[in-house]
């Protein structure tokens, strides 16, 4: 019996507590939003299969929410990850400043050459914005990675961000692109509905 997919990619979301990692995963995998999720304890993941470049890609998206409060994500979390999404909250400047620490954690624990993506969540809360898009775009360019702003609540750019990372992994595994340096960072300029003020505070 033929497999229902062509490739299996393990993705990992990391970032400070409260930036919305769990909400993003639920939105992507189940197209649902609920701001009363119970914070993740231990390792949890969701699965969704997407079509990219004519291939069926099974994405296994791992959630580290509930662990980052211990200030460490062990090597076990990073093992086998082909793509890592670094998440911050656009209304929380500290969560953005800590992205540098998460970058360091990736360097120390993840496989060399793992694909990375910077993601600013809660862009539906524009009135409470503390991190400007230009700041994040600059950081992404410094690291040679893509950048998106998303809203797990409105679903803005969520599919686009995950699909972009999966496409980069696919192209890299196919040998048609070498290294992150040849990949121009991407900023999605879509705006979110400023009237939406609810937030997902977990993960």
UniProtKB/Swiss-Prot annotation:
Keywords: Cell junction, Cell membrane, Cell projection, Cytoplasmic vesicle, Endosome, Golgi apparatus, GTP-binding, Hydrolase, Isopeptide bond, Lipoprotein, Magnesium, Membrane, Metal-binding, Methylation, Nucleotide-binding, Phosphoprotein, Prenylation, Protein transport, Tight junction, Transport, Ubl conjugation. Residues 201-203 form a propeptide. Detected in several types of epithelia, including intestine, kidney, liver and in endothelial cells. One of its GO terms (cellular component) is bicellular tight junction. It is a lipid-anchor. GO terms for molecular function: GTP binding; GTPase activity. It holds the Pfam family Ras. It catalyses: GTP + H2O = GDP + phosphate + H(+). There is a cross-link at residues 46, 58 (Glycyl lysine isopeptide (Lys-Gly) (interchain with G-Cter in ubiquitin)). Residues 179-189 have a biased composition (Polar residues). A lipid is attached at residues 194-195, 199 ((Microbial infection) N6-stearoyl lysine). GO terms for biological process: bicellular tight junction assembly; cellular response to insulin stimulus; cortical actin cytoskeleton organization; endocytic recycling; endosomal transport; endothelial cell chemotaxis; establishment of Sertoli cell barrier; exocytosis. Switch 1, switch 2 and the interswitch regions are characteristic of Rab GTPases and mediate the interactions with Rab downstream effectors. The switch regions undergo conformational changes upon nucleotide binding which drive interaction with specific sets of effector proteins, with most effectors only binding to GTP-bound Rab. A lipid is attached at residue 200 (S-geranylgeranyl cysteine). The gene is RAB13. It is found in: Cell membrane; Cytoplasmic vesicle membrane; Cell junction, Tight junction; Golgi apparatus, trans-Golgi network membrane. It comes from Homo sapiens. Its EC number is 3.6.5.2. Residues 173-203 are annotated as: Disordered. The small GTPases Rab are key regulators of intracellular membrane trafficking, from the formation of transport vesicles to their fusion with membranes. Rabs cycle between an inactive GDP-bound form and an active GTP-bound form that is able to recruit to membranes different sets of downstream effectors directly responsible for vesicle formation, movement, tethering and fusion. RAB13 is involved in endocytic recycling and regulates the transport to the plasma membrane of transmembrane proteins like the tight junction protein OCLN/occludin. The keyword rRNA-binding does not apply. The keyword Transport applies. Belongs to the small GTPase superfamily. Rab family. GTP binds at residues 17-18, 20-23, 40, 66, 121-122, 124, 152-153. InterPro entries: P-loop_NTPase, Small_GTP-bd, Small_GTPase, Small_GTPase_Rab. This is Ras-related protein Rab-13. Induction: Up-regulated during osteoclast differentiation. Mg(2+) binds at residues 22, 40, 63.
